[in-house]
From Swiss-Prot:
GO process terms (BP): amino acid metabolic process; pyridoxal phosphate biosynthetic process; pyridoxine biosynthetic process
Gene: pdxS
Reported function: Catalyzes the formation of pyridoxal 5'-phosphate from ribose 5-phosphate (RBP), glyceraldehyde 3-phosphate (G3P) and ammonia. The ammonia is provided by the PdxT subunit. Can also use ribulose 5-phosphate and dihydroxyacetone phosphate as substrates, resulting from enzyme-catalyzed isomerization of RBP and G3P, respectively.
Name of the top EC class for this enzyme: lyase
Protein name in the entry: Pyridoxal 5'-phosphate synthase subunit PdxS
Pfam families: SOR_SNZ (PF01680)
GO molecular function terms listed in the Swiss-Prot or TrEMBL record: pyridoxal 5'-phosphate synthase (glutamine hydrolysing) activity
Coiled coil: none
Pathway of action: Cofactor biosynthesis; pyridoxal 5'-phosphate biosynthesis
Family: Belongs to the PdxS/SNZ family.
UniProt xrefs under CDD domains: pdxS
Amino acid sequence: MTNVTGTERVKRGMAEMQKGGVIMDVINAEQAKIAEEAGAVAVMALERVPADIRAAGGVSRMADPTIVEEVMGAVSIPVMAKCRIGHLVEARVLESLGVDYIDESEVLTPADEVYHLNKRDYTVPFVCGCRDIGEAARRIAEGASMLRTKGEPGTGNIVEAVRHMRQVNAEIRQVASLREDELMTYAKNTGAPYEVLLEIKRLGRLPVVNFAAGGVATPADAALMMQLGADGVFVGSGIFKSENPAKFARAIVEATTHYEDYELIASLSKGLGNAMKGIEISTLLPEQRMQERGW
């Protein structure tokens, strides 16, 4: 039987359908239903949210397929799941389960310290993290259909997501201003594939959607990332590590949609209870910084 992979246009189109929305991490059917009722456009099924992965340490792997199937059976919105960077078999297992997207994620412990997956070989579209134009372009060349900032997952601290979004957007503007004969040197210096840079220059933007992720903890955080140019928002630990997950979920969805309505964001932020406990980035050891994973 011939293995028919999804075309690049179809995969990118599927990701475009999530634009402007919020994607929430969930660990069971109950949380998935809360996310769907709050207006999430998709959920990410995993065993532990990033804050718990960070706290537990050790090796973090793909979720038990039972959890993924439980979440898939509980909601009608798309379901994503994470595999380790470079783990061919975890990705194939998730594809066989019928997930809607796979996140080749630095939140999990990398399986390969040299190679990312060739995502063009799969029918299912992939999501990947990036901090700059080099990482973004390499993931696109490998076949990623959606990007997200890496931020610093599980910290409840938005500063790294802001840094990464600003960095990528500044470099897009730089690429757009370069002559085509200057792009090859830029490609060499950044490790960005030349053909992807040409596409970015032609479009004046990335050819795939770029969501914010890694540290979104409040409605204001979500609105901030949208104002900085994010196409949507991933919320990992920020929902179910907060004092009132259902209220936080609804408020973050509304703030993402109405990110320039400050009176509404103020109203949404009232009486929410405590957000997740945050971590100052400077207190993390180099080996604790998940954003450093991937290349």
